[in-house]
Amino acid sequence: MSSPRDSRFALPLQVAAVCYRRVNSHAEFLLVNTNGGSKWTFPKGAPEPRLSHSQAAEREAKEEAGASGIIEPRHFHIYVHSKGVFWQPGGVQEYVVKAFLMDVRQTRSPEEDYRNPTWFEAERARVILAKGREVKYAHELQTVIDRALEHIGVARMAAAR
């Protein structure tokens, strides 16, 4: 299924739910396995015609991570993401992704059970999002975590562990 294009961007558009919860003085992020199962990512997908972008991101969080909560109506960050590998038919496709923060209040089994939703502390999420990705895309995903922490008012802890 192809993603719709936003006229402001040359790449197809996706929406992501950056699911978090506060635990004491830090934040944890809910990540899901990619379709291939070898990498971790945020719940995301194509916008839906009858839903706002935040509503579509909220739906992705429910389907892929089994998460529900309070999603912000406006995106807090935009990043570039890739799918595929150059040696497969179709190669690599890049997407522009609008990221929406979701304060998760409840989780249940996701509709897409192979996604294995898992909570990670921010520093671990930064590492695991980068694993197996090209530097450019790894940095994009790590920046999402950093921007999310800024937005929710949680200081980033040093990775001195």
Where in this protein do the model-derived segments appear?
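Active-site segment of metal-dependent pyrophosphate-handling enzymes
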Residues: 62, 66-107
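Short, charged/polar surface micro-motifs in flexible loops or helix N-caps
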Residues: 23-25, 36-39, 48-49, 80-83, ...
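Nudix hydrolase/Nudix homology domain
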Residues: 38-39, 107-161
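Conserved hydrophobic/aromatic beta-strand scaffold that supports enzyme active sites
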Residues: 18, 31, 99-101, 119
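Conserved Nudix-box catalytic region and its N-terminal flanking loop in Nudix hydrolases
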Residues: 26-68
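Short, solvent-exposed loop/turn segments that connect beta-strands within catalytic domains
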Residues: 22-28, 89-92
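Acidic, metal-coordinating catalytic segment for phosphate/diphosphate chemistry
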Residues: 1-25
